[in-house]
Structures are given as structure tokens and as C-alpha cells.
Amino acid sequence: MAEIPRIVLPHGGYRKLTVYDKSETIYQATVLFCRRFLPAHGDRTVDQMTQAARSCKQNIAEGSAASGTSKETEIKLTNVARATLDELEEDYLDRLKAEGLAPWPMADRRAMAAKRYGREHADWAYWKPIFESRPKDVFCNLMITLINQTKKLLDGMIARQEEDFKKFGGVRERMHAARTAARGESWDKGIYSCLDGATTLADLNARADEIRRKISSAVYSIKRRK
């Protein structure tokens, strides 16, 4: 007997994801950057940067929560999280330009060391003492490295979500599949119950004839509706 498909898929668990840990670190570091290097009042960049950083982690969380009923919503929210990191990266690049500096080249030993550290550590607890002590230019470059690592993780997540959508479809499709399977299961149970009640071969044949008549009647009704 076929298993009835689930309507609400497993969801949540975003706090166990490395990409969420990195997004939390990016948010906390951005708040610290604004506190250390930007004026407390009168600079709209402070709100823009903190909101972009917060939006990333919030959309990851909301997408994870929505994935049980809507894979489409999950994909959209994860894409929003990815887009906000592009915006935030531009803010850090602008800060470097304002200081007359450029981002570290990919082959720069500092960039390579930052990438290694970022691959090994995602939690804010590991990054906090580093960001509290580094000058503005190093801070910006470290953030650019972290942001790019997180964007790559989000790209992989979006690709997996797209495959899940192809496999499981939307909630309406799953509801239809579940209803269809449930009707089939109910029909199967009715047939088996009817046949199991037979006590003789003649009785079994009579019950089978009755089932065939019901099937023919159902087919006729369907054709008339068409």
C-alpha cells in the first residue's frame, strides 16, 4: 500500500547551520564596526549597514521556518539574504575607498589567512576579540572575506532548495497528492474488507461481481461529468 505523502515537510533547524552562524557573526561585527568607526548620530550608513546585516540572518531564519509549507518562499527569502550581503559588501568596499585603500588581493597572505580562519570558525565568539582590536582597514577586509564565504554557502543552499522544490513541489501539489493517496487507501481498504468477509467461493465471486458493478458505475458517472 502506497504511503500517503507528507503535506508539511521537515523545517526549521537553521541555528544548526554554519551559514546562519556566519550571518550572526556578520551582524554582530557590523554593529561593532558602526560603534567603533562611524558617528553615533547623523550618518544614515549606520542604519543601512546594520539593517542589511540583520536582514541576512533574519531571512535565513524565516526561510527555514517557511520551508515546511512553501519551498518557493524559502528560495525567495534565501535569495533576499544573499542580495543583502551584496549590499553590505559594497558598504565595506566604500569605506576602504574613502580611506584611499583597496581590498586585499586574493593571493595576499592576509586574505589567505582570513579565509582559512573563516573556514574553521563561524561563531562570533571566535571573531569578537579580533574585530575589537583591528584597525578600520583590516576590519573591512576581514568582513569582505566573511561576506564572500557566506555568499558561497548561500549559493549552495539555494541550489539545494531548488532541487527540493523540483522533488517535492509546492504545498498545493503535496495536498493533492496526499488526498489522492488517501482516497486510494480508503478504496483499497474497502475492497479488502469486502473480500475478506467472504466465507465460501460462491460468496467471494458474488462480492467480486458487486465490486465490478460499482467500478463500472463510477466510470460511467465520470464519463457523464466530462
Regions found by a protein language model. Name each.
Residues 1-226:
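Amphipathic alpha-helical assembly/interaction segments
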